[in-house]
Amino acid sequence: MVKLTSIAAGVAAIAAGASATTTLAQSDERVNLVELGVYVSDIRAHLAQYYMFQAAHPTETYPVEVAEAVFNYGDFTTMLTGISPDQVTRMITGVPWYSTRLKPAISKALSKDGIYTIAN
């Protein structure tokens, strides 16, 4: 006879192994925070490239929160709340390496977090 506790333990193990998924609008703040996290990490990894882009496009500005997050190596996600979805999209898609570097990294990060997006 199987004990009820061993069945419960088995169900808990299966549930822990299955990743939960969530479908969110592309403008949802949780999606924006994942996108901004990837963006900040990319800026840190390719800072010279972003400086050159900024020099060539001085009208392309960044919110002060993004600049602070780039140079604050602690938990920066709380700094990035409140940036509008339109501004997030403009910043991320406005660089020439969006399609080749940022978009795949964002897709991977969203998938890792079990987040799938739908168009607004």
Swiss-Prot record:
One cellular component (GO) term of this entry: fungal-type vacuole
Annotated disulfide bonds: none
Membrane-spanning parts: 7-25
Gene Ontology terms for molecular function: structural constituent of cell wall
Alphabetic keyword roster: Membrane, Transmembrane, Transmembrane helix
Membrane association type: Single-pass membrane protein
Keyword Transmembrane attributed: yes
Pfam families: SRP1_TIP1 (PF00660)
Primary subcellular site in the record, as a coarse category: membrane
Biological process, per Gene Ontology: fungal-type cell wall organization
Places the protein is found: Membrane
Similarity field: Belongs to the SRP1/TIP1 family. Seripauperin subfamily.
Protein name as catalogued: Seripauperin-20
Organism listed in the record: Saccharomyces cerevisiae (strain ATCC 204508 / S288c)
Gene behind this protein: PAU20
